[in-house]
């Protein structure tokens, strides 16, 4: 989702240290290059360095993932993942990245409650292939290794997205080059993790709010053809992985982005033989009375499930205020939608959320379960 581009610290250089998740370096960066106490400045890619929890003096190292757990990796049968699987779904997951692996309270929750993980940033194009043909997998590998060592399913996120896209890709203006670059990127990344990824978000956020295609660099050069190019390359690289189209604001049943956007386009593309297995609804939801509250989500999910796909999934769930009944509404919508295979919340604790100010997650800033967690756990009993 929208993370790196939204958390840049705008404090003048030399006047203030960057706060947690703020930018602290990178090509063209003119702001602060130091982080507040308790944080370290870590390279995400050549263009973006970020303040993350840890110390530059020996802290923040990646822990030994240990011996792989048997089966699905849930040591606690009372965890959310174990409960939702008992209801016939595949997983209850969360978002993490390599910079979370040294956070023991967070990781202990992941091990107990969640059976699937999605990389927040380290599988995006700017992190994986910052320069043409030069692939950097070290940070993504850390999350994949952790997931495999602990029996967690993995959602690959994301192969094509208009944001966090290197400038060299944006500069491409001819069809042949763009096609070749997409095919090579998708093939290389998917092949590296072949057999390890359950779901791939092949294309992410490709629709405008009116249901038309977003005017991304991919669309400017290739029109809608980039969708088929990406999905076919992914299918060829790993025939077993389920391939998804993922987007936000798919939370109102009659909204144009849902109907004439996602559903109509997906039905057309599937009829053309493009191997789209599923639709991912990010579900970044508002409070009651907001534009896209949880109350409208069940009807919207059923509209998405009516498309000609095998699966739907809730991929980046967070809810402004995290009201218990709102979370239960969304969880029940998946339980009552046969095509819905699982739920991923976009982060573990409010402290680590990209919407931190709205306290949108299941655990508070001290990594303690909130009322929403208890309500979800009870709903899954």
Curated annotation (Swiss-Prot):
Catalytic-site annotation from UniProt: 205, 316
pH dependence: Optimum pH is 6.0.
UniProt protein name: Endo-1,4-beta-xylanase D
Assigned protein family: Belongs to the glycosyl hydrolase 10 (cellulase F) family.
Keyword ATP-binding listed: no
Domain CBM1 span(s) in chain numbering: 19-52
CC annotations in GO: extracellular region
Lineage of producing organism: Eukaryota, Fungi, Dikarya, Ascomycota, Pezizomycotina
Organism: Gibberella zeae (strain ATCC MYA-4620 / CBS 123657 / FGSC 9075 / NRRL 31084 / PH-1)
